[in-house]
Amino acid sequence: MLNWAPTLNFRYRFNKRSNLRINYRGTTTQPGMSDLLSIVDDSDPLNIKVGNPGLKPAFTNRLRLFYNTYIQSHQRSIMTYLNYSNTRNSISNKVTYDEITGGRTTQPENINGNWDVNAAVMFNTSVDSAGVWNINTFTTGGYNHYVSFLSLDKKSDSQKNVTRSMNIGERLSGSYRNSWLEFELDGSLNYTHSRNALQASSDMDTWQFSYGTNINLTLPWGTSVSTDLHENSRRGYSDESLNTNELIWNAQVSHSLL
């Protein structure tokens, strides 16, 4: 049994406030011992479990790229990253249906095609020279390609199924800050698109969005007040009870005795 786990870490500093990092890591996942044993478990004749001595270890590659910089003269910061991973020889349970006995036989098998990628960009800048007014934006996106064996019902063999999902998100905020007041307006939007090759009923196109404000007050004699008010909404779910609007208000008062 060999566990192969290569690692690479690279960092380059362009200057004191800008740097690039690249990280790679490979990991090996061994099959479970019970999956490798050439044993037939027929204690339940209608649900037979069979091992697979020919299973290969799964191997996952993970790559991360990260960059950030800060421009002091404009009080501006930029950050971005990209993550990618794929897995060879993933393990999924395959089911075979016996029409004569009505029983099902389950056996683990290797399957390929699993990978995902996600990325983000953050931009924060001061609008004025004093750094009192600020704007921040954070954009994210991702894609997932998931492959497995799937039985549509109890009387059918497993088939290779592919689920493709994509998500995009954005958060935008503007803020004002001085010695005693912090005030922010923000809004966010997230969209998820998912398609299932064998189960169209599992397809999704959903939206989640939120908007509101955050306020922090620093009062005399060690007293501070903070509050936030946000409207959170969801749309696109087949279950109407999940398509909701929620208004959430939080408030806090604190006092320091020191």
Predicted feature descriptions by range:
Residues 1-258:
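Exposed, low-structure sequence patches enriched in small/polar residues
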